[in-house]
Amino acid sequence: MSYKTELHCHTAEVSDCATASAEWVVNKYIETGYDTLFITNHMSRHTFGIGKQQKYHGGENWNEKMDFYFEGFRLVTEIAKDKNLNILLGVELNSNTDGNDYLIYGLDEEFYRSFPDILDAPLKDVIGKVHKAGGLFFQPHPFRNSIKIKKPAMLDGIEAFNGHIGHDSRNDIANMWADKYGLMKLSGSDMHHEKHTPNGGILTDMPITSEKQLVEILKSGSYTPLHIGEDPVITQN
């Protein structure tokens, strides 16, 4: 398996807790040998309000919020154009119902634009719509402090490696949990800042060039997740 794909990455233009710019992210992932990069910026009340650093200055209209959110994704796509790095869409949803983060893959912009209640809807309704549309629903860093682990039957899988150097994600426990309940295992760098080095993702026999292809590969198990069960050296956020 020789193609490397990042599944968890944020950029400063959208995620309120990120400081790594889209341009830096693209160049860093090319430098470190990745073929595909999923941008999974936070979709949360903080994204569209006052967080650590307010970036959204629009109104309450959902389409206005989505314009802001997807402008960030399109910026990464434009920067990576002709640079031999596939840029694909994922979303890290922060649900108002439980405060947890969730990674969603396999869906397009229209799905999110057509679901203005996604932040407040009961989680079972969100998962149902994701699955009906052909997507997958994962819990990242499920054993990090303040996170509430969800019932395995609700999830397609979990992150068994989260590479954020500012948090103890207890990847060893996550790996054992995934084994115990037969969950798909993800690996992601959880890139936020320039002092982070890409350290997560999956290896595949072919390059991943579409969101739907990722879903097929994950369901088939035809991938190798990087650093499963290992913990990065924790420094600071």
Question: What kind of region is each of these model predictions?
Answer:
Residues 58-63, 110-116, 161:
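Glycine-rich tight-turn/loop motif centered on a GG-T
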Residues 4, 30, 77-81, 122-138, ...:
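Surface-exposed amphipathic alpha-helices with a cationic face
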Residues 1-89, 94-96, 153, 195-196:
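An N-terminally biased module of ancient metal coordination in phosphate/nucleic-acid-related enzymes
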Residues 90-91, 123-126, 140-148:
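Short, charged beta->alpha transition segments
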Residues 16-17, 68, 117-118, 166, ...:
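Residues that cap or flank secondary-structure elements
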Residues 1-7, 11, 21-27, 48, ...:
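Charged catalytic cores and adjacent phosphate/nucleic-acid-binding surfaces used
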Residues 100-134:
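Binuclear metal-dependent hydrolase catalytic cores centered on His/Asp/Glu-rich metal-binding motifs
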Residues 39, 87-89, 139-140, 185-187:
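General beta-strand structural signal in soluble alpha/beta enzymes
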